[in-house]
């Protein structure tokens, strides 16, 4: 028995590497990426705040070297994400709505993250240390088929993570950061097989991270890359070291330049000790089901923990976990851990026990079927008024909800539900040998839930999470085109005033109050509107209920 046979936990037959049909994989990806891309407004809070910075660049209201909305610069995110969104808005106007134009490149980034995770897993699974045990009488899995099956599993595991669902569909700098992280993992994975592509990926990955507000994570990844390349016995990895070093130097230089310009380059965002219970809950739901599978991988492959197929994703995951903890349990920092966590989860599939696999399957069946049923019941209540209690709850949560029935959206939702039932029947009706079988139901359930929300509930969610309703309530009190001083207002509210209300806004501390005839202050749901010397209160409007966000509108005394 050689060394690899002694320490490799995987035993995989040729039947187990059954290929997931490409049409099915593409359908999964389409059902995950496309819903929510069309037919909605920018949503609160980070989504519309980032969109506002991009829109102001496209309109020429702000310098490309100093983006701002109403004089308020972005709170983070570097500069590259705003350039990306602003450039696409500028290129597609006036033919495409600015909000949709801004979402298009970020949907492309989500596709890139999914693709990079697939290819990173594929190349890592081809390494000698990752191969399963050879069978005594033959019939073991061919290397390309084995690698492809694990890559399919990694992609499904990534789509199944609940944390990527909302944040992955936003127009925010975190998506460019996530692309940079995934690109770096791909570079380390593909270096022995696709040298030129791997070098280019590594070179640009850390630059993307530094230019989108995560220079510290870029430097930590560079340290990981240098360590992996330095201890590798492969010449290709040793040669790759210089590209990791060059990328790290360029990333540090870019972050320094952004800081010199007054942007979020070396922006220290470490906060105090987070609540341990809250962090544990965040990590559990945000990373489900990839985290338990990744933990199984670390245990099963513990004797190969220093090999590249385990070390690269594991160290990247630890960086993402550490960044989230350092920022007080920030969920957006935890995004960095998801692609490498999915890669790690894929290597558990050859070793997973039938009991754990069945538990994941049945949990997915009951949880996602129940979620889909709830979505359908609420949808029916919105249009029929039955069940009465459900319809009343919807009316309380979104007062004045305007029904917007759509046959195409209804048919899409019905088709997705039938596809889910067919997938459940396929998975549970007979024993399946494919390695990726344990993650197909979680991925399918997440895709189903997201598609139902973005079809059946899209009008409801759009009215509850968009600023459009609040702007409609403000218009009777403030003439379109008026100048509004809104000191202390969030970038999201400033964007809404310009985009939905067509007002001229100034969010700076004192300058706007000298030039504008209207003053607007954000007021807590139950707080009393403050008295402002030289101004008289005209109205107070709320987004939805008595406890929701509200604004107080003042006019200057004459």
Predicted regions and their residues:
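Aromatic-rich transmembrane-lumenal/periplasmic boundary elements in polytopic membrane proteins
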Residues: 30, 34-64
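Loop-to-helix entry region of an early transmembrane alpha helix in multi-pass inner-membrane enzymes
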Residues: 79, 83, 92-120, 144-151, ...
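Membrane-embedded alpha-helical segments of multi-pass membrane proteins
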Residues: 104-112, 175-183, 336-344
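Transmembrane-helix motifs of polytopic, lipid-linked glycan transferases
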Residues: 104-142, 160, 183
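Short helix- or helix-capping micro-motifs
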Residues: 154-159
């Amino acid at each position: 028995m050689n060394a690899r046979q002694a320490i490799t936990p995987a035993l995989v037959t040729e039947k187990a590497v059954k290929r997931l049909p490409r049409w099915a994989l593409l359908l999964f990806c389409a059902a995950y990426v496309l819903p929510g891309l069309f037919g909605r407004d920018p949503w609160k809070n980070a989504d519309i705040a980032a969109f506002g910075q991009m829109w102001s660049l496209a309109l020429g209201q702000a310098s490309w070297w100093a983006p701002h909305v109403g004089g308020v610069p972005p709170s983070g995110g570097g500069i590259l994400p705003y350039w990306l969104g602003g450039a696409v808005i500028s290129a597609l106007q006036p033919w495409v709505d600015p909000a949709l134009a801004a979402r298009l490149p970020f949907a492309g980034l989500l596709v890139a993250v999914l693709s990079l995770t697939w290819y990173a897993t594929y190349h890592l699974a081809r390494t000698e240390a990752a191969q399963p045990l050879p069978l005594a009488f033959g019939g073991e899995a061919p290397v390309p088929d084995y690698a492809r099956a694990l890559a399919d599993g990694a992609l499904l595991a990534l789509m199944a993570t609940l944390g990527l669902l909302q944040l992955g569909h936003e127009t925010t700098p975190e998506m460019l950061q996530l692309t940079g992280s995934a690109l770096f993992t791909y570079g380390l994975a593909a270096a022995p097989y696709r040298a030129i592509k791997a070098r280019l990926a590594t070179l640009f990955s850390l630059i993307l991270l530094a230019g989108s507000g995560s220079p510290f994570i870029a430097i930590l990844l560079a340290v990981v890359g240098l360590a992996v390349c330095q201890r590798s016995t492969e010449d290709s990895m040793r040669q790759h070291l210089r590209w990791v070093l060059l990328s790290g130097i360029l990333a540090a230089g870019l972050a320094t330049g952004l800081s010199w310009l007054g942007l979020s380059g070396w922006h220290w965002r470490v906060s105090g000790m987070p609540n341990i219970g809250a962090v544990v809950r965040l990590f559990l739901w945000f990373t489900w089901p990839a985290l338990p599978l990744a933990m199984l991988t670390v245990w099963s492959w513990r004797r190969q923990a220093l090999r590249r197929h385990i070390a690269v994703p594991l160290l990247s995951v630890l960086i993402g976990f550490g960044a989230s903890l350092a920022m007080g349990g920030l969920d957006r920092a935890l995004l960095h851990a998801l692609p490498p966590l999915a890669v790690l989860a894929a290597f558990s599939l050859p070793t997973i026990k039938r009991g754990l696999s069945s538990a994941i399957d049945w949990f997915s069946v009951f949880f996602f079927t129940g979620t889909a049923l709830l979505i359908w019941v609420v949808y029916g209540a919105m249009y029929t008024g039955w069940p009465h209690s459900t319809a009343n709850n919807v009316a309380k949560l979104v007062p004045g909800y305007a029904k917007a029935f759509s046959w195409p959206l209804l048919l899409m939702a019905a088709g997705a539900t039938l596809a889910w039932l067919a997938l459940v029947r396929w998975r549970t009706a007979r024993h399946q040998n494919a390695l990726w079988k344990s993650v197909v139901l979680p991925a399918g359930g997440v895709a189903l839930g997201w598609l139902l929300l973005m079809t059946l509930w899209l009008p409801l969610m759009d009215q509850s999470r968009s600023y459009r309703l609040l702007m409609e309530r403000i218009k009777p009190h403030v003439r379109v085109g008026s100048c509004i001083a809104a000191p202390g207002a969030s970038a999201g509210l400033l964007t809404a005033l310009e985009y939905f209300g067509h007002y001229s806004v100034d969010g700076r501390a004192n300058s706007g109050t000298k030039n504008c005839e209207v003053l607007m202050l954000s007021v807590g749901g139950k707080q009393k509107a403050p008295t402002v010397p030289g101004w008289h209160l005209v109205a107070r409007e709320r987004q939805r209920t008595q406890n929701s966000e509200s604004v107080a509108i003042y006019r200057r005394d004459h």
